[in-house]
């Protein structure tokens, strides 16, 4: 399954090109806060597809040759066969790439891409989940800040106090 190999490569490359078809691109997004549901989301990489980037950069073919034990040339031929298959499927229906997303054709024949939402290709954010943050009522904090704080000093034995402080 080529989609599985593309998904693996996306964890380590910001661009994975399928020669003669297009490229999957990653863009880093900072952590974000959604005010409507008080949710902090970790940093992520958003996935997009560019049909115009079709030149073979060798990344996918080299990966396939290493993983499947094929020659580089044989890997390029296998990718070409699969691209032909994908193009035929797209003419009829949508193409679902597991762990990547869904591809379809628009009326002009351009490829549209709908990425899977639950996959974060940013390794630094591995296992981080969105965090719900409750709103803090500032008026309650202001009330407690105005309360005086009293300290009592033991005047009877100041030497013990200094010994205690010096022990730290």
Place the predicted regions along the sequence by residue.
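Long, low-complexity intrinsically disordered regions
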Residues: 146-153
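Cytosolic/nucleoplasmic/matrix-facing N-terminal domains/tails
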Residues: 1-146
